[in-house]
A protein has these predicted regions:
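Outer-membrane beta-barrel pore domains
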Residues: 27-39, 50-82, 92-99, 105-106, ...
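Glycine-rich, flexible loop segments associated with nucleotide phosphate handling
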Residues: 214-219, 243-249, 266-272, 359-366, ...
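Loop-centered beta-sheet repeat module
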Residues: 320-402
Length: 569
């Protein structure tokens, strides 16, 4: 869901060294013999020399000693693998692994650690030209690798893995209730600790390096925690958010299958199901992000789509995407569905917004399209990705945003890079909060009264109405412009510092609940103890120009310190 609560107004995932962006899976390395392969670079100093497996075996000196080091018991292997990788920038490297990317493909711009991805994110497809099946560095998969189940999963490229992500924040906001930090996201309640997300994936990646056969893949994901409120689609377990406003809940942000056809140009990927909206720098799943909190720009745009999207690499540098879906944060079970209008137009309570006896349950659950192009140059160090996502008639819906934007990445050297995003998004025909008729409906029936999103359909977190220029029109078009950037400095393979400036313009207040221009300046540190354990402390200053948007509308600024721990398994 791309709103915070009206009262105050995130599976690609990284695991361990992979950190595959939900919006663009990273570059997995080839599969190894007893455990899943890894996507991150091997730790510095790793050797392929033949060192005897005597005494305390060192898999970093001799990969063949990995089994001897880990032992046979799955529980022993599990905790020893954490110990093995502690202080390392990657797992042991198999010298006999097949190539992990297509010959002549642009350079891999980043490594994980310390970044949340290795390839510049584009989403909508398992990364073409750089992905091998079974390529996640997972302590759980390593633990069960020598069992019957583990051998079967490894043989066929299946993996089960995930992470646990608790977090906290200290805020200058004194309104300590759900939504008290709004419109700041992913730190929903001021001055508290929370379980952000527990995530479990079942994956099979199609092999996009090979060129000799059609391959297939899938992802089944589940999330539990506070962050469910940002991924919720209307019609899929949405009662937790829209009826009860539960602090913690569950969701299934990615449920899709893929088919990879290597012979079409440089590779064609077809994905069908529920998937993360394209393109975006940030993503719902914690390991796919530089920082713990998210920009307002990201928090209030598209999150997921249900449909079919195709990604075609025309050349190794140029790719195009086209997709058809049912709106944004919309589900097929709501498409074209009509429900009874409990408050049709009447003399006692005029309702010109929805005068008929029925209306669409979600007017935004209609056929929509996505079109994107991506170009990479400078041998992989520059990348631009313009997109139009979730495009239809733009009628006011649960989250029927018409998104037009672009992402851009540039690597200066091995220590510095930046990521930039800009977009315009809008919805049409949003009820005007300044109009007397709309005000009368809201007074008599509650928020969004007389619409598909008022009582009895939604008790909490319904989409905002608009603060139009004047009180005359019944409806108006609401738009927002967002722009954010991450400037990143990595002094070594286990640390990265991110500076995030942002401007978000919400003139009708439909996205945030308060019509204002928002400015943000945040800085964060990402420190990896190993490819499996990461901490992300940060501090951010937010300011609203034109209205008091923070602390329940009493202040025009807020200062928030926050952080989390991501523990992969």
């Amino acid at each position: 869901m791309h709103r915070l609560s009206k009262s105050a107004v995130i599976i690609s995932g990284v695991l361990g060294a992979t950190s595959m962006a939900a919006v663009a899976q990273t570059t997995p390395a080839p599969t190894i013999s007893i455990a899943p392969a890894i996507t991150s670079a091997p730790a510095p100093g790793a050797s392929t020399a033949s060192v005897p497996c005597t005494g305390t075996p060192d898999p970093y000196a001799n990969y063949n000693c990995l089994d001897a080091y880990l032992g046979d018991n799955p529980f022993t292997r599990f905790y020893r693998y954490y110990g093995l990788e502690m202080g390392q920038a990657g797992p042991p490297s198999d010298p006999n692994a097949p190539p992990s990317r297509v010959d002549g493909w642009p350079r891999t711009p980043q490594t994980t650690p310390p970044m949340p991805f290795t390839e510049w994110p584009y989403g909508g497809a398992t990364a073409i030209g750089v992905t091998r099946s079974g390529s996640i560095d997972s302590p759980l998969m390593t633990a069960i690798a020598n069992t019957g189940l583990g051998r079967w999963m490894n043989e066929y490229g299946f993996q089960v893995y995930g992470w646990i992500d608790p977090g906290f924040n200290f805020s200058s906001n004194s309104l300590r209730k759900p939504g008290g930090n709004a419109p700041v996201s992913y730190a929903y309640i001021p001055n508290t600790a929370q379980l952000d997300q527990v995530v479990l994936y079942l994956d099979r990646f199609p092999d996009t390096v090979q060129k000799d056969h059609i391959d297939w893949g899938l992802r089944l994901s589940a999330i539990y925690g506070e962050n469910y409120r940002y991924t919720t689609s209307y019609g899929l377990a949405s009662y937790q958010l829209l009826k009860y406003n539960a602090v913690n809940g569950y969701d299934f942000p990615m449920l899709y299958g893929e088919v990879y056809i290597p012979w079409v140009a440089q590779g064609l990927m077809l994905r069908a199901g529920r998937y993360i909206s394209v393109p975006d720098i940030e993503a719902q799943l914690a390991p796919n992000n530089y920082m713990y909190t998210h920009s307002i720009t990201y928090a209030l745009d598209n999150y997921t789509n249900e449909g079919l999207i195709g990604t075609l690499f025309v050349t190794k540098n140029l790719s195009i995407q086209m997709g058809v879906e049912i709106g944004t944060e919309a589900t097929f079970n709501n498409a074209w569905k009509q429900v009874g209008n409990p408050n049709p137009n009447s003399a006692a309570l005029p309702n010109p917004l929805y005068p008929g006896s029925t209306f669409a349950k979600d007017p935004g659950a209609v056929p929509s399209y996505t079109v994107c192009a991506r170009y990479t140059w400078n041998d992989g160090w520059d990348d631009i990705n313009p997109c139009a996502n979730g495009i239809n008639g733009g009628q006011w819906g649960y989250n029927n945003l018409q998104w037009y934007g672009v992402t851009y990445y540039h690597k200066f050297n091995d220590h510095w890079h930046l990521a930039f995003e800009f977009y315009d998004e809008h919805e049409n025909g949003v009820p005007n909060l300044k109009n007397p008729t709309v005000q009368a409906l809201n007074t008599a029936l509650g928020a969004d009264g007389g619409t598909p999103f008022g009582s009895p359909f939604m008790s909490h977190n319904a989409p905002n109405e608009a603060q139009c220029k004047t009180s005359t029109p019944l409806r108006c078009n609401a738009y927002a412009i967002g722009s954010t950037m991450y400037v990143n400095y990595s002094p070594d393979p286990l640390n990265n510092f991110s500076f995030r400036p942002e401007i978000y313009y919400d003139p009708q207040g439909q996205r945030t609940g308060t019509a204002a221009t928002y400015y943000e300046f945040s800085i964060g540190w990402q420190h990896w103890f190993s490819p499996q354990i990461e901490i992300r402390p940060e501090v951010g200053y937010y300011h609203s120009n034109g209205a008091n948007a923070f602390n329940g509308g009493t202040k025009n600024w807020t200062l928030i310190g926050a952080g989390d721990v991501i523990w992969h398994f």
